[in-house]
Curated annotation (Swiss-Prot):
Family: Belongs to the SecA family.
HAMAP family linked to this entry: SecA
UniProt gene name: secA
GO biological process: intracellular protein transmembrane transport; protein import; protein targeting; protein transport by the Sec complex
Protein name: Protein translocase subunit SecA
Location of the protein in the cell: Cell inner membrane; Cytoplasm
Length: 840
């Protein structure tokens, strides 16, 4: 009530932003006659002039009106397209680091040109992020004409480019590419062994196209680079063989909401008998139990042609949001191998995580982030909370006149599809184009089969036919066109109405199921009614749809019985519509909670990732690691003495045997210390003499290898050790996260426990990195300098896989190594105490 009163007095936040921007648009328009009179050469000369003004300290905001006017004139001269005033508003919103919500067909691609041009003038680079390679390539070529005309360089990052090509594309003023390519390049860069091999530059400014799809839908799946872990494939086949002999409810229970399957007590007994194992919960068999559960998930929860397809003898994941295939992406924790065993195709080795990051944390690293989409308002709270991004709804250029009809609800899926086919036939009879949205490949092919039998010509657009995606979508507005599309495949391609289509009512949209998120339903509707065109939309639902069955079944079944539904008879009832909306709100809240939790846990990893990547980069950039190595030697000696000697006592009380063995193990130095040889030496003198001998040993190694080779060796060994232990640490953190939820039963906050124990694991890893680097440095035998290059090449050429494949493999062995003390020098070599540096 109060909110409504305040809105009437002050206007909504959205209205206030638009009111503030309006004078800027007038100022841009005032430059238009001036720009129009300029010759091509004079217009192009504006770019170096702007760059000079920026170098002289003029802020971008002061340049905005004139720069936007130049970019607009550039678009007119190269593309023959003049951005409307509402597109200028969208451009200003993007420049200010907000999300511009613009309806389908309002020209989002062109909107980005103005803020990209302005921000690229700084020379620090601008990233435009799209959902697929096709759009990245298309937009970089199409809009690239404007930038090139105005004297800026354009790069495009797509799958299949080699490193030099990627580096060149990232070095351009404007870079187009997909979220996956950007994220994986960031991870790959932080696995490189030479600074000059890195391809990305600083993360300055990014505009994310289809921002809801990238920052919300895909945020639940972290980007992961993994490498092969040793495991026998026979295990997967053996376990797969027994799964059909387990019965639902008797031997296992499933929870579709959380996508989990659990063995019952009878199930455990039956599995032990079938596999010939005494006790599945024996620590030595825990690995088998894990793989039984993954095989159950593969058989019970993952459906062929819905979650994955089998193509050319490979199991390929289908993106649940876009319906596109994701070749090269693999499920983690042995699930992908379980699916391969289920489908009886070749099992590829299990993978272990080498590097991982979430989209949330990758995009939050940009100095400035903005986005655009047709549907963001329903998720405005999430954008504000996680990314600190405000959503601004941009007015349409022409009034929207599409008609959205009420949902039609049927009892069964078969009845629903019959009704959908009937409506398609009616539209086809009058040559009215229809776009039908389905939730997965299986449903689109089922509907396609019905239409074939009824003699209705149509096109199917799903992950199996993605090559023709843009072409099929572009023709979806032609007279009599019938297009069946999974989810939001084809986003970014305009559906232009063909001749005579306006007269028969424009493009008609049919949704065959409600999506988990209202936003996705709105995206489907938004394909019709672009730029004031006529159009309509209707959703057909059944009580057998996943959303209804899982989230609204209890309320709806009783309601339906009271209403009394008959076969092939639809029902429209406000209570049912309300129940559906409640179900969608429930799922949206659940998904937001999952994403928020993922981020909270990844934030712990993110702090550790930043420390490791920063140290790696310093090691790559550092001309001389000698001071760092000498500090490590001193730290390790302090660690040995802390456990074996006491400054208050004399040699007869010290553990000289352990000092001898540890110095030999780590530094390769035979000490042969005895109580007799040490006499009455005091602790300080003893420590200093030991350090002096170790320093001399180090200098002898340096003389043996030569100064230049020693520096190379130090850099290589530190990087190689960091990578090895970071990989193991990721695996440890994965296993910690898996079991941490159970702490809730012990009245512990799982997140706090994860932070505390994750930090302890990180401390332990840092100590092990120091130990291993020094041990290798004092023991390694290098005959010639080329050996180092060969070792480095071998390390760089390790096989990698990209996708949702978090670490798997054997549980790590726990070690009782000494942890880095809070007051110890920081292992990164900064010279500060650990608690003041990496241990913060």
């Amino acid at each position: 009530m109060l909110t409504d009163i305040l809105k009437k007095i002050f206007g909504s936040q959205n209205e206030r932003i638009l009111k503030r921007i309006a004078p800027l648009v007038d100022e841009i328009n005032s430059y238009e006659p001036v720009m129009r009179k300029l010759s091509d050469a004079a217009l192009k000369a504006k770019t170096p002039e702007f760059k000079q003004r920026i170098a002289n300290g003029e802020p971008l905001d002061d340049l905005l009106p004139e720069a936007f006017a130049v970019a607009r004139e550039g678009a007119v001269r190269t593309l023959g397209m003049r951005p409307f005033d509402v597109q200028m508003i969208g451009g200003i919103v993007l420049h200010e680091g907000m999300i511009a919500e613009m309806k389908t067909g309002e020209g989002k691609t062109l909107v980005a040109v103005m803020p990209i041009y302005l921000n690229a003038l700084t020379g620090r680079g601008v990233h435009l992020v799209t959902v697929n390679d096709y759009l990245a390539r298309r937009d970089s070529e199409w809009m690239g004409q404007v930038y090139k005309f105005l004297g800026l360089s354009v790069g495009c990052i797509v799958h299949g480019l080699d490193d030099p090509e990627r580096k060149e594309a990232y070095g351009a003023d404007v870079t187009y590419g997909t979220n996956n390519e950007y994220g994986f390049d960031y991870l790959r860069d932080n696995m490189k062994f030479r600074i000059e091999d890195m391809v990305q530059r600083e993360l300055n400014y990014a505009i994310v196209d289809e921002v809801d799809s990238i920052l919300i839908d895909e945020a639940r799946t972290p980007l992961i680079i993994s490498g092969p872990a040793e495991k026998s494939t026979a295990l997967y086949y053996n376990i797969n063989r027994i799964i059909p002999q387990l019965k639902p409810e008797t031997h296992y229970t499933k929870e579709e909401k959380s996508r989990t399957v659990a063995l019952t007590e009878d199930g455990v007994t039956r599995t032990e008998k079938l596999l010939g194992v005494d006790n599945l919960y024996d620590p030595r068999q825990i690995d088998i139990l894990h793989h039984v559960q993954q095989a159950l998930r593969a058989h019970v929860l993952f459906k062929r042609d819905v979650d994955y397809i089998v193509k050319d003898g490979k199991v390929i994941i289908v993106d649940e949001f876009t319906g596109r295939l994701m070749p090269g992406r693999r499920y983690s924790e042995g699930l992908h191998q379980a699916l391969e065993a289920k489908e009886n195709v070749h099992i590829e080795n299990e993978n272990q995580t080498l590097a991982s990051i979430t989209f949330q944390n990758y995009f939050r690293m940009f100095d400035k982030l903005a986005g655009m989409t047709g549907t963001a308002e329903t998720e405005a709270a999430e954008f504000a909370k996680i990314y600190k991004l405000e959503v601004v709804v941009i007015p349409t250029h022409r009034k929207m006149i599409r008609e959205d009809y009420a949902d039609c609800i049927y009892r069964t899926e078969a009845e629903k599809f019959r009704a959908v086919a009937e409506e398609i036939k009616e539209a086809y009879a009058v040559k009215r184009p229809v776009l039908v949205g389905t939730v997965n490949i299986a449903k689109s092919e089922k509907l396609s089969g019905i239409l074939k039998r009824q003699g209705v010509p149509h096109q199917v657009l799903n992950a199996k036919h993605h090559e023709k995606e843009a072409e099929i979508v572009a023709l979806a507005g032609q007279p009599g066109a019938v297009t069946i599309s999974t989810n939001m495949a084809g986003r970014g391609t305009d559906i232009v109405l063909g001749p005579g289509v306006v007269d028969v009512g424009g493009l008609h949209i049919i949704g065959t199921e409600r999506h988990e998120a209202r936003r996705i339903d709105n995206q489907l509707r938004g394909r019709s009614g672009r730029q004031g065109d006529p159009g309509s939309s209707r959703f057909y639902l059944s009580l057998e749809d996943d959303l209804m069955r899982i989230f609204a079944a209890d309320r709806l079944s009783g309601l339906m019985q009271r209403i009394g539904m008959k076969e092939d008879e639809p029902i429209e009832h406000r209570l049912i519509t309300k129940a559906i909306e409640n179900a969608q709100s429930k799922v949206e809240a659940q998904n937001f909670s999952i994403r928020k939790q993922l981020l909270e846990y990844d934030d712990v990893m993110n702090q550790q990732r930043e420390v490791i990547y920063r140290q790696r980069r310093e090691a790559l950039q550092g001309e001389n690691l000698k001071p760092v190595v000498l500090d490590m030697i001193e730290d390790l000696l302090e660690g040995i003495l802390a456990e074996t000697a006491d400054e208050k006592h004399y040699a007869e009380d010290w553990d000289l045997e352990k000092i001898n063995s540890e110095v030999l193990r780590l530094f390769g130095l035979q000490m042969n210390l005895t109580v007799e040889s040490l006499g009455d030496i005091e602790y300080e003198e003893f420590r200093d003499s030991l350090l002096e001998r170790l320093t001399k040993r180090y200098e002898a190694r340096e003389q043996e290898f030569g100064e230049s080779m020693m520096r190379e060796l130090e850099s290589y060994l530190l990087l190689q050790t960091v990578d090895t232990y970071w990989k193991d640490h990721l695996l440890n953190m994965d296993h910690l996260k898996e079991g941490i939820g159970l702490r809730g039963y012990g009245q512990q906050d799982p997140l706090i426990a994860y932070k505390r124990e994750g930090h302890a694991l990180f401390d332990e890893m840092i100590e092990r990195i120091k130990e291993e680097t020094i041990r290798l440095l004092f023991h390694i035998q290098i005959q010639r300098e080329e050996q180092l290059d060969e070792l480095r090449k071998e390390q760089e050429d390790q096989p990698m896989f990209f996708g949702p494949a978090e670490g798997a493999g054997q549980k790590p062995q726990t070690r009782k190594d000494r942890k880095v003390g809070r007051n110890d020098p920081c292992p990164c070599g900064s010279g500060k105490k650990y608690k003041k540096c990496c241990g913060k």
